[in-house]
């Protein structure tokens, strides 16, 4: 895989719990130059995950989640914000929610999209980062892997954390005990600090 190019479809082909911590420190890029390092993610796992939109099977809303990995699943939350997810493989209905970014470039454009938001809150939260990157319903189903879409995720050479911190997901009412949220240790760019959980580290199974 070359630097500064979209992650290939094979990167997303695994279970969302495998892909999620590997997305940490990757860079979300827009064609107009906005760039942000991924600092916080959550995995959602289809029929085995009551918190996933895809838990009860495919609907018109969740159709993208049941398609090829490497596509963007975009949905509306709280009646006011968009959120972005990378569709994964492994099993039907898997996706990784991108919860927070560290802004790297194109910050003027992010500020223009977000208004007078302080720098540290430009992209700390799924709705905030989607707004900062101008994401809306038209981006649902966008292919992150082609290099011709307006958004993609790339590897700039910064490896994922060797021991990403894991904890319960945020803003859900079901499956609240599952530690399927991962963050970059020590990052100042999180939607919410991670509660200390003894021995919590990245896990393929979520145990």
UniProtKB/Swiss-Prot annotation:
Question: Which Gene Ontology BP terms does the record give?
Answer: base-excision repair
Q: What Pfam families would the database entry show?
A: Pur_DNA_glyco (PF02245)
Name the InterPro entries for this protein: Formyl_transferase-like_C_sf, MPG, MPG_sf
Return one GO MF term: alkylbase DNA N-glycosylase activity
- EC numbers on record: 3.2.2.-
**What keywords would UniProt list here?**
DNA damage, DNA repair, Hydrolase
Q: Which domain of life is it from?
A: Bacteria
Q: Which SUPFAM superfamilies match?
A: FMT C-terminal domain-like
**Keyword Repeat attributed:** no
> Where does the sequence pass through the membrane?
none
CDD domains given in the database record:
AAG
Q: Does the keyword DNA damage apply?
A: yes
Which PANTHER family does the record associate with it? DNA-3-METHYLADENINE GLYCOSYLASE (PTHR10429:SF0)
Family as reported in the entry's similarity comment: Belongs to the DNA glycosylase MPG family.
Protein name as catalogued: Putative 3-methyladenine DNA glycosylase
Q: Which organism is it from?
A: Xanthomonas campestris pv. campestris (strain ATCC 33913 / DSM 3586 / NCPPB 528 / LMG 568 / P 25)
């Amino acid at each position: 895989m070359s630097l500064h190019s979209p992650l290939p479809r094979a990167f997303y082909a695994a279970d969302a719990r495998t892909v999620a911590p590997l997305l940490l420190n990757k860079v979300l890029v827009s064609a107009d130059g906005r760039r942000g390092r991924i600092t916080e993610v959550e995995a959602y796992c289809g029929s085995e995950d009551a918190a996933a939109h895809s838990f009860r099977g495919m609907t018109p809303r969740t159709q993208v989640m049941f398609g090829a990995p490497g596509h963007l699943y975009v949905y509306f939350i709280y009646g006011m914000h968009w959120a972005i997810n990378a569709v994964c493989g492994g099993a039907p209905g898997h996706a990784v929610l991108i919860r927070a970014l560290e802004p790297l470039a194109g910050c003027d454009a992010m500020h223009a999209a977000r208004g007078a938001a302080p720098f540290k809150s430009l992209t700390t939260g799924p709705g905030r980062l989607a707004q900062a990157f101008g994401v809306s319903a038209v981006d649902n189903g966008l292919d992150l892997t082609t290099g011709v879409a307006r958004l993609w995720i790339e590897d700039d050479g910064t490896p994922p954390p060797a021991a990403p911190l894991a904890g319960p997901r945020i803003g859900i009412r079901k499956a609240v005990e599952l530690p399927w949220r991962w963050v970059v240790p020590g990052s100042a760019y999180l939607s919410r600090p991670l509660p200390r959980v003894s021995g919590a580290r990245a896990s393929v199974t979520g145990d």
